[in-house]
Amino acid sequence: FKSIINYFPLEYKKILPDGKRLGIKISYIEQDKPRGLPDAFILGEKFIGKNNVSLILGDNFFYGQYLSERLKDSVKLSKGAKVFLHRVSHPERYGVAKVKNNKITIIKEKPKKYISDLAITGLYFFDNKVVEFAKKLKPSKRGELEIVDLLNKYKKVNKLSADYIGRGG
């Protein structure tokens, strides 16, 4: 299983140079300019290989009851993608997901009209088809590949699931 951390790569390199002290191997690939989160998968194609992968946004802190167990379960994901959601007061500030009968029915980035109060946290797990799906994305109006568009590709083929992060405790 591989992980991609997308944000502040130089700071991470200083703190965790190669991972040897932790008994793991860490590799770094940097985007030369902002092209969106899914671009990390395209850049990391050789690194990912046939492995499943996680994407962790490095400017977030994740905690919550039973989070370790949920992460261990998520690493076992064999097909599809999983996002972690958290209830928020101002969903218009986040990418959000609407869930019905344990299925994600809508994913939207910073919706102007209320859809749901379940924010996408920046903690994702993907099968190795993520590179293939990312390569098929078209840049948004911002000129970047959007994570919401990638998640919608998985939703379209019925391979997107969600888990929840509650308050710590």
What feature does the model see in each segment?
Residues 54, 68, 72-75, 103-169:
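Catalytic-core segments of class I nucleotidyltransferases/pyrophosphorylases
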Residues 7, 99, 125-126:
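A conserved hydrophobic position in a structured secondary element of the catalytic/binding core
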Residues 64-92:
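Conserved donor-nucleotide/metal-binding helix-loop-beta segment in metal-dependent transferases, i.e.
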Residues 17-23, 98-99, 153-155:
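Short, conserved catalytic or adaptor-binding loops enriched in Gly and charged residues
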Residues 23-25, 49-52, 77-81, 93-94, ...:
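Short coil/turn connectors at secondary-structure junctions
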Residues 89-93, 98-102, 110:
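Ligand/cofactor pocket segment of small-molecule handling proteins
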Residues 57-58, 84, 126-127:
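A secondary-structure boundary/capping signal
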